[in-house]
Curated annotation (Swiss-Prot):
InterPro entries in alphabetical order: CBF_beta, CBF_bsu_sf
Protein name, UniProt field: Core-binding factor subunit beta homolog bro-1
Gene Ontology BP annotations: negative regulation of DNA-templated transcription; negative regulation of transcription by RNA polymerase II; nematode male tail tip morphogenesis; positive regulation of locomotion involved in locomotory behavior; regulation of transcription by RNA polymerase II; stem cell population maintenance
Compartments (UniProt record): Cytoplasm; Nucleus
Keyword field: Cytoplasm, Nucleus
Main location class: cytoplasm
Pfam families, per the entry: CBF_beta (PF02312)
PANTHER family: CORE-BINDING FACTOR SUBUNIT BETA (PTHR10276:SF3), CORE-BINDING FACTOR, BETA SUBUNIT (PTHR10276)
Presence of keyword Transmembrane helix: no
Family, similarity comment: Belongs to the CBF-beta family.
Length: 152
C-alpha cells in the first residue's frame, strides 16, 4: 500500500483535515498536562532544543510529533518550520509560532512540493527517483506508535 497519493495538490485541497489545518489554527504543547506549568515549560524548551515539537491541534484534536527543520526564538515566541512529513497521504510541512510561557500558538500546514528528478545510471537507462521516503521517525518512535494502536 502506498503511503502517498498520486495527485498531491488536489488531495491537499480536498482533504477534510488539511483544508482546516492549511489556515492558522490554535495549537498547544499538550505533553505532561498534569505536571506543574514550570515543569511543562522546561520540557517544552528541551523538546525545542532537540528539534522536536509535539503539537495538539485544538480544533481537530490531532496530535503530531513534529521534527523541526528550523526554529528561531524571539523572547517567548518560537517561530518554526517542520521537516516534511506525510499526513493523510500528502507531503506537508508545519509552520507557525508557539509561546514558551503559555505553551500555545498559531500553526498551519503547507503542502510540501518534493523535487522530482531522474537519476541517470547509464547512457541508455533513466530510472526515476524513488517516490517513497522515510517519514522521519526512528524505529523506537514507530514501535511506540504501533504499541499505541496506530497501524503503521
Amino acid at each position: 500500500m502506498k503511503r502517498t497519493t498520486t495527485d498531491q495538490q488536489s488531495s491537499f485541497q480536498t482533504d477534510y483535515f488539511l483544508t482546516q489545518l492549511s489556515h492558522f489554527t490554535e495549537a498547544k504543547f499538550s505533553l505532561f498536562e498534569h505536571a506543574p506549568l514550570s515543569e511543562r515549560r522546561e520540557r517544552f524548551r528541551v523538546h525545542v532544543e532537540r528539534d522536536e515539537m509535539p503539537l495538539t491541534f485544538c480544533k481537530t484534536g490531532i496530535n503530531i510529533p513534529v521534527k523541526l527543520e528550523w526554529s528561531q526564538t524571539n523572547g517567548n515566541e518560537i517561530s518554526f518550520r517542520s521537516r516534511p512529513l506525510v499526513f493523510n497521504g500528502i507531503w506537508v510541512k508545519v509552520i507557525g509560532a508557539m509561546n514558551s510561557e503559555s505553551l500555545e500558538g498559531r500553526v498551519r500546514f503547507e503542502r510540501f512540493q518534493r523535487e522530482k528528478r531522474d537519476r541517470v545510471i547509464s547512457e541508455t537507462f533513466v530510472f526515476p527517483e524513488v517516490e517513497e521516503e522515510p517519514i522521519g521517525l526512528t524505529d523506537a518512535e514507530i514501535a511506540a506508535l504501533r504499541r499505541d494502536g496506530l497501524p503503521i
